[in-house]
Amino acid sequence: MKMTLKELGEMLGARVQGNELLTISSVGTLESAQTDQLSFLANSKYRSQLESTQAGAVLLSEKEANNFQGNALIVKDPYVAFARVAQRLDTTPKAAVGIHPSAQIDASAQIGQGAAIGANAVIGAGVIIGEHCQIGPGCVIGEHSILGSNTRLWANVTLYHDVHLGQNCIIHSGAVLGSDGFGYANERGTWVKIPQTGGVRIGDNVEIGANTAVDRGALGHTEIGDGVILDNQVQIAHNAIIGKHTAIAGGSIIAGSTKLGQYCIVGGNSAIAGHLKIADGVHVSGGTNVTSEIREPGTYSSATVAVENKLWRRNTVRFRQLDDLFNRVKLLEKQQKTQD
């Protein structure tokens, strides 16, 4: 697909600078874009690349456009505008086209108009697949699961029974939705499994990354709100509730029955303990361990940043001496008070 700068400007509500009839076929970085591509400047540290870019046109803020003589689309937020254009010019192939003859579809399943199901997919009893869904090769959809319209499952996604997905969701390869939660009772050292009888409920416009796992609820459902984005290899434990438009980066773990608020951001390789409530608008830095409730929005961190190894070793030794140092300071304070 190709669009002129004028057409893109109308789509974005942008002001066009330069040749309105220039045809754009795709997007690219300032450093690598060619004359038929659109790029963007969203961070001033890349301003030097703007001066030498070969891009046919650039998405710019009003401030940056004052110093640029080339073709441009002037917008409020260049990065968001870039995302919109990238969506419009997207050439990603479909996960499936038509219904492959090797797909195994239960007679009781309901398949919406225009839905596509790839090779060797398995659709269980009572499944409802909405209009224009794409089910990639090798996917398994368990009994009584529901997919809203325009939802896309890439190859080898597994949905257990009673998993509900909203509209316009994207689930990447290897994701498993609805597996058993980690629920056991301990009887004198022996683990007794607790059947996980709940389901999974996922809202509209949710994207779930490759090899991510969302466990089903023990009693009641695990819930993921509208607009949530989960990166690759994220673990959502049973009965967790993820508020709408929250983002969780790769390798993070949300333990069971934790309620994570709306519009939160969880950095990569973070862990949030179970049975906690996290307020709306909380930003957890990468590598952070959250072990208690967070009641106010803001940024929270616990990880130690990388330093030169020799310094790290010295600091580690000092950390192990911290309790002794505390006791010595406490004794000195006591002696000082006695002298006073």
UniProtKB/Swiss-Prot annotation:
Pfam families: Hexapep (PF00132), LpxD (PF04613). Belongs to the transferase hexapeptide repeat family. LpxD subfamily. Keywords: Acyltransferase, Lipid A biosynthesis, Lipid biosynthesis, Lipid metabolism, Repeat, Transferase. It catalyses: a UDP-3-O-[(3R)-3-hydroxyacyl]-alpha-D-glucosamine + a (3R)-hydroxyacyl-[ACP] = a UDP-2-N,3-O-bis[(3R)-3-hydroxyacyl]-alpha-D-glucosamine + holo-[ACP] + H(+). Catalyzes the N-acylation of UDP-3-O-acylglucosamine using 3-hydroxyacyl-ACP as the acyl donor. Is involved in the biosynthesis of lipid A, a phosphorylated glycolipid that anchors the lipopolysaccharide to the outer membrane of the cell. PANTHER family: UDP-3-O-ACYLGLUCOSAMINE N-ACYLTRANSFERASE, UDP-3-O-ACYLGLUCOSAMINE N-ACYLTRANSFERASE 1, MITOCHONDRIAL-RELATED. Homotrimer. It is an enzyme of class 2 (transferase). The gene is lpxD. Pathway: Bacterial outer membrane biogenesis; LPS lipid A biosynthesis. One of its GO terms (biological process) is lipid A biosynthetic process. One of its GO terms (cellular component) is membrane. NCBIfam families: lipid_A_lpxD, PRK00892.1. It comes from Shewanella denitrificans (strain OS217 / ATCC BAA-1090 / DSM 15013). The active site is at 238 (proton acceptor). Signal peptide: none annotated. InterPro entries: Hexapep, LpxD, Trimer_LpxA-like_sf, UDP_GlcNAc_AcTrfase_non-rep. This is UDP-3-O-acylglucosamine N-acyltransferase. Its EC number is 2.3.1.191. GO terms for molecular function: N-acyltransferase activity. It comes from the Bacteria.
